[in-house]
Amino acid sequence: IFEFKAGQYAELFIGDCKEKHFSMANSPNTNELEFHIKTLDGGEVSNYIKNDLKLGEIITVKGPYGNAYLREKHKGPIIAVAGGTGLAPILSIIEYSQEIEMKQPINIYYGAQSEQELYFIEKLDMITKTNNNLKFNPVIIEKSKNKSIRQGLVTDALIEDINDFDGYKAYLAG
């Protein structure tokens, strides 16, 4: 069993590739590890996973690492900011916070260049609609016809929405 805290990451050794760090994207309460991996031009590990990884191939996982994990005893409001695949550790934090029934306000900001770069948006919409303490704020730089997605920078949206950050815990990834 690989034990970790929501928000942490692991070091993966895959094939003959150089080790690579990826954040867990699921709750620590499962018997699985979920990683979100974007295929990058020239990305040795991501391209190996996409094109060459075989079913049953051994992947060595070391860790966990990182201090940006959910502080379960914090009772004040939380801000979770993600960009790109930085959504992975934020999803881990959000999922676990709901499992342990944290009730304080949790404001999720998810930024990207375009609407096409946003992923898991339906899952986040569903989670926030069924949990009154969660608020989901997708923000993109490019214009969109989708009125539920704000245009601009995620940092500007955050400042527009919250004028006093006293007492907040913030988790940022991406």
Q: How does the language model describe each region?
A:
Residues 1-57, 112-114, 139-143:
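Ferredoxin-reductase
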Residues 105-174:
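Reductase modules of NAD(P)H-dependent flavoproteins
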Residues 75, 96-106:
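Conserved S-adenosyl-L-methionine
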Residues 78-93:
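A phosphate-binding catalytic loop at a beta-strand-loop-alpha-helix junction
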Residues 63-75:
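A short, basic/flexible loop-to-alpha-helix module at the beginning of a structural domain
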Residues 24, 91-99:
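Histidine-anchored nucleotide/phosphate-binding helix
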Residues 43, 60-64, 151-156:
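Short gly/ser/thr-rich secondary-structure transition/capping motifs
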